[in-house]
């Protein structure tokens, strides 16, 4: 069967394409730009065209469109005119989950890392899982795979457009719940209501795994049989404390050693009302948020019967997904890291991880805010998001599918940030020049956002490298 995918360059739709290719289907697609995701698909035989035209639909049997594409899109209109079924991600998720054990990872933050960790744990256990991940994952080689149909299918269950409600998972994780996607969910109550519906779709509450550290996640679940996980330093000193009984999976004695994180894992036994040391783990990710992601993955893998050896091997091996604390390079003592963080909570967590790993560095942060709706709806949440940074620079808003005034929205956001050194730096080119000029040896430049703001870091590295080369030439 021939599938044509509109918006194939995105993480979610490229994952759909990989699964369809694994199943033996013909895949074509269209998007506005080429990237590493489309290059990988083209190497596998997908025919991708850049731009959008009715003729691109070709002889497709089915058309699949990203949620960001409206029904009036010219390729969707052409497909309907010709009687070609038009599907969304949710339709395929629903089809693929029939007759298969599904592990769904939902939540506002941490979905990509948690999903990838579970998939890697299953792989290291000798299972060939299927997976759909919303980010490039070098350790797995690809962001989606159909795998063995008899093995679990691990899905990053995106809540955008309520897509995750297409799933009735056997095991589900809710990493955290904080109001997001304000264009779909006009209020926090509507956002939480969608997660409540998702939680109810898990047949057995004992197979629902929830972050006990997050108030939003606890609110939307509320079932006493759900497994909870979290970080509890007191457990190392008093493992018999009744207060710890709320957590089924607990990380204690968390310590950071450069690029490595170590923690002890304690397990609460509900039958005996006691705790036991389950193991000691090391991973190549930093930050408390990544410890929580690891706990969620451990709980899911253990529920699936995966042994500690495979779990530990995957944790020690996993290098992270692209654009998740992604070290881009170092020039003249200046390190550049990029992260997808674009929500205030994600920014705080990423900054905390950066401070833990680079405690002596001056941290220069560039944020490219993402979408006008999110920027204006969350203005009051940004006040202390940058407290751990030394210098804060705010770029023009990346509009994505929206329209508005990028500079005005950036100024509105910057005006809410309680930081002694915050400025608006304009578009990507202007931001690059401004930030490159203030960087000095020993600095860490952290570029944040879900748009193309990563280019600031890449171009800064290039400019710094050229300046360094010129300096060396003049000295000789």
Swiss-Prot record:
InterPro entries linked to this entry: Mur-like_cat_sf (IPR036565), Mur_ligase_C (IPR004101), Mur_ligase_C_dom_sf (IPR036615), Mur_ligase_cen (IPR013221), Mur_ligase_N (IPR000713), MurCDEF_pg_biosynth (IPR050061), UDP-N-AcMur_Ala_ligase_MurC (IPR005758)
Source organism (scientific name): Roseiflexus castenholzii (strain DSM 13941 / HLO8)
HAMAP family reported in the protein's UniProt record: MurC
Protein family membership: Belongs to the MurCDEF family.
Name recorded for this polypeptide: UDP-N-acetylmuramate--L-alanine ligase
GO molecular function: ATP binding; UDP-N-acetylmuramate-L-alanine ligase activity
Biological processes per GO annotation: cell division; cell wall organization; peptidoglycan biosynthetic process; regulation of cell shape
Pfam families, per database record: Mur_ligase (PF01225), Mur_ligase_C (PF02875), Mur_ligase_M (PF08245)
Lineage summary: Bacteria, Bacillati, Chloroflexota, Chloroflexia, Chloroflexales
Location of this chain's protein in the cell: Cytoplasm
Thylakoid among keywords: no
GO cellular component, as recorded: cytoplasm
Record-listed ATP binding positions: 107-113
Reaction catalyzed: UDP-N-acetyl-alpha-D-muramate + L-alanine + ATP = UDP-N-acetyl-alpha-D-muramoyl-L-alanine + ADP + phosphate + H(+)
Catalytic activity, EC: 6.3.2.8
Pathway field: Cell wall biogenesis; peptidoglycan biosynthesis
NCBIfam families: murC
Entry function: Cell wall formation.
Domain of life: Bacteria
Protein keywords: ATP-binding, Cell cycle, Cell division, Cell shape, Cell wall biogenesis/degradation, Cytoplasm, Ligase, Nucleotide-binding, Peptidoglycan synthesis
EC supergroup of this enzyme: ligase
Signal peptide segment: none
Major location category of this protein: cytoplasm
């Amino acid at each position: 069967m021939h599938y044509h995918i509109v918006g194939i360059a995105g993480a979610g739709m490229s994952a759909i394409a990989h699964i369809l290719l694994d199943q033996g289907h013909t895949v074509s697609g269209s998007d506005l730009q080429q990237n590493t995701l489309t290059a990988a698909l083209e190497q596998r035989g997908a025919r991708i065209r850049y731009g959008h035209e009715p003729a691109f639909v070709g002889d497709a049997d089915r058309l699949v469109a990203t949620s960001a594409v409206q029904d009036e899109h010219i390729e969707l209109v052409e497909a309907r005119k010709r009687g070609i079924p038009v599907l969304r991600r949710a339709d395929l998720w629903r089809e693929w989950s029939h007759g298969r054990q599904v592990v769904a990872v939902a939540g506002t933050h941490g979905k990509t890392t948690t999903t990838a960790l579970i998939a890697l744990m299953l792989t290291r256990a000798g299972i060939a899982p299927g997976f759909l991940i919303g980010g490039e994952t070098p350790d797995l080689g690809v962001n989606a795979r159909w795998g063995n149909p008899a093995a679990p299918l691990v899905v990053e269950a995106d809540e955008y457009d309520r897509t995750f409600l297409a799933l009735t998972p056997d095991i589900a994780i809710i990493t955290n719940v904080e109001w997001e996607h304000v264009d779909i969910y006009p209020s926090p109550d509507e956002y939480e209501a969608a997660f409540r519906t998702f939680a109810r779709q898990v047949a057995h509450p004992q197979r629902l795994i929830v972050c006990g550290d997050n108030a939003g996640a606890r609110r939307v679940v509320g079932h006493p049989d759900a497994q909870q996980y979290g970080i509890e330093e007191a457990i190392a000193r008093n493992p018999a404390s009744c207060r710890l009984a709320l957590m089924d999976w607990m990380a204690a004695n968390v310590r950071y050693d450069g690029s490595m994180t170590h923690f002890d894992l304690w397990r609460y036994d509900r039958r005996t009302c006691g705790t036991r040391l389950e193991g000691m783990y090391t991973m190549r990710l930093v930050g408390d948020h990544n410890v929580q992601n690891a706990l969620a993955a451990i709980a899911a893998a253990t529920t699936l019967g995966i042994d500690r050896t495979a779990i530990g091997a995957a944790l020690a091996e996993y290098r992270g997904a692209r654009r998740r604390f992604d070290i881009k390079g170092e020039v003249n003592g200046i390190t550049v890291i990029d992260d997808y963080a674009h929500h205030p909570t994600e920014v705080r967590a990423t900054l905390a991880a950066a401070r833990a790993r680079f405690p002596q560095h001056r941290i220069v942060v560039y944020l490219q805010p993402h979408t006008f709706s999110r920027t204006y709806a969350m203005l009051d949440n940004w006040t202390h998001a940058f407290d751990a940074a030394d210098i804060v620079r705010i770029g023009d808003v990346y509009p994505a599918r929206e329209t508005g005034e990028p500079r005005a929205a950036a100024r509105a956001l910057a005006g809410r940030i309680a930081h002694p050194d915050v400025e608006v730096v304009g578009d990507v080119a202007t931001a690059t020049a401004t930030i490159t000029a203030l960087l000095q040896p020993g600095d860490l430049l952290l570029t944040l956002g879900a748009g193309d703001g990563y280019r600031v870091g890449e171009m800064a590295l290039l400019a710094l490298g050229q300046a360094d080369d010129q300096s060396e030439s003049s000295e000789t």
